[in-house]
Amino acid sequence: MNQTFVKSVTEQLPQLGLLQDEPMKKHTTFRIGGPADYYAEPDMSRISKLIEMAKACDMPVTVIGNGSNLLVGDKGIRGLVIGIGKGLSEIEVTEAVAQDFTAQDNCHIITAGAGAILAAVAAKAAEASLSGLEFASGIPGSVGGAVVMNAGAYGGEIKDVLIDATVLTADGELKTVTRDELDLSYRHSIVPEKGYIVLSARFRLTPKPKDEIKSYMAELRAKRVEKQPLEYPSAGSTFKRPEGYFAGKLIMDAGLRGYSVGDAQVSEKHCGFVVNKGEAAAADVLTLIKDVQETVLKQFGVKLEPEVKMIGEF
């Protein structure tokens, strides 16, 4: 235990609710992961101070969103883990004004905290009869995570509607970064390499009849239920889409449907997903991923790159 850090937090941020030895399986959709030394979900008023305290104690800081694209090692994460959650989950709809550089005819803006669930933002947009985020209606991740990885599905991506993001820099300064400056591409942004922490994002949307928006969103959700293994914990798509191929089909054609290591399994419903059938360990998932990569490379000459982010000690 880092007594200096705990004492500082207790005295200066008494309402924070700092947790010690917090199981990370409680904070990932994979339901896998060992303990974080310290875990907290600060709001906007506390996050900068908390990071400052951790740095003063030479403590590493890891920031996560909804944990929907993470595999945390069985030995957990050293230092402080900051969960961007309910304290940063506000969603606000406004109409763009003429002096706003984003303004277009009938353009509206949704501002969402990084902890807001992307699907909830899409639902809020639909209720306001605003189109552009339909593709996100079934994405379980947070706004912050979606910006970091330029989340997308069914032909839509965050970069299609993002205006800018407010971030906390590695120096502890608030900064607004435009979509172009974020250098968004397939499952990529400059956020990790710059050491930014996304605090909020603004999206540009356009009016459309509410029933049309909701009908299309319902159609996409039905496709997800039909094709994806939502009945089991997972981290979503395990591998990035290799150019010219589909990861799931390559894995299926390699004869790996249902392949298991412990309770980690290549989904029988969609081979692009690795699922946790019960008590899978991170080591099981890691071994399975490597086995799949080796088999697909050997059979088809295609190197699969993991989409799931691996953090912590394995």
Swiss-Prot record:
<dbReference type="GO" id="GO:0071555">
    <property type="term" value="P:cell wall organization"/>
</dbReference>
<dbReference type="GO" id="GO:0008762">
    <property type="term" value="F:UDP-N-acetylmuramate dehydrogenase activity"/>
</dbReference>
<feature type="active site" description="Proton donor">
    <location>
        <position position="237"/>
    </location>
</feature>
<dbReference type="Pfam" id="PF01565">
    <property type="entry name" value="FAD_binding_4"/>
</dbReference>
<dbReference type="InterPro" id="IPR016169">
    <property type="entry name" value="FAD-bd_PCMH_sub2"/>
</dbReference>
<feature type="active site">
    <location>
        <position position="307"/>
    </location>
</feature>
<comment type="function">
    <text>Cell wall formation.</text>
</comment>
<dbReference type="GO" id="GO:0071949">
    <property type="term" value="F:FAD binding"/>
</dbReference>
<protein>
    <recommendedName>
        <fullName>UDP-N-acetylenolpyruvoylglucosamine reductase</fullName>
        <ecNumber>1.3.1.98</ecNumber>
    </recommendedName>
</protein>
<keyword id="KW-0963">Cytoplasm</keyword>
<keyword id="KW-0573">Peptidoglycan synthesis</keyword>
<dbReference type="InterPro" id="IPR036635">
    <property type="entry name" value="MurB_C_sf"/>
</dbReference>
<dbReference type="InterPro" id="IPR003170">
    <property type="entry name" value="MurB"/>
</dbReference>
<keyword id="KW-0133">Cell shape</keyword>
<dbReference type="GO" id="GO:0008360">
    <property type="term" value="P:regulation of cell shape"/>
</dbReference>
<keyword id="KW-0131">Cell cycle</keyword>
<dbReference type="InterPro" id="IPR016166">
    <property type="entry name" value="FAD-bd_PCMH"/>
</dbReference>
<keyword id="KW-0274">FAD</keyword>
<keyword id="KW-0132">Cell division</keyword>
<keyword id="KW-0285">Flavoprotein</keyword>
<dbReference type="Pfam" id="PF02873">
    <property type="entry name" value="MurB_C"/>
</dbReference>
<feature type="active site">
    <location>
        <position position="187"/>
    </location>
</feature>
<feature type="domain" description="FAD-binding PCMH-type">
    <location>
        <begin position="31"/>
        <end position="208"/>
    </location>
</feature>
<dbReference type="InterPro" id="IPR006094">
    <property type="entry name" value="Oxid_FAD_bind_N"/>
</dbReference>
<dbReference type="InterPro" id="IPR036318">
    <property type="entry name" value="FAD-bd_PCMH-like_sf"/>
</dbReference>
<keyword id="KW-0560">Oxidoreductase</keyword>
<dbReference type="GO" id="GO:0005829">
    <property type="term" value="C:cytosol"/>
</dbReference>
<keyword id="KW-0521">NADP</keyword>
<dbReference type="GO" id="GO:0009252">
    <property type="term" value="P:peptidoglycan biosynthetic process"/>
</dbReference>
<keyword id="KW-0961">Cell wall biogenesis/degradation</keyword>
<dbReference type="InterPro" id="IPR016167">
    <property type="entry name" value="FAD-bd_PCMH_sub1"/>
</dbReference>
<dbReference type="GO" id="GO:0051301">
    <property type="term" value="P:cell division"/>
</dbReference>
<dbReference type="InterPro" id="IPR011601">
    <property type="entry name" value="MurB_C"/>
</dbReference>
<comment type="pathway">
    <text>Cell wall biogenesis; peptidoglycan biosynthesis.</text>
</comment>
<comment type="similarity">
    <text>Belongs to the MurB family.</text>
</comment>
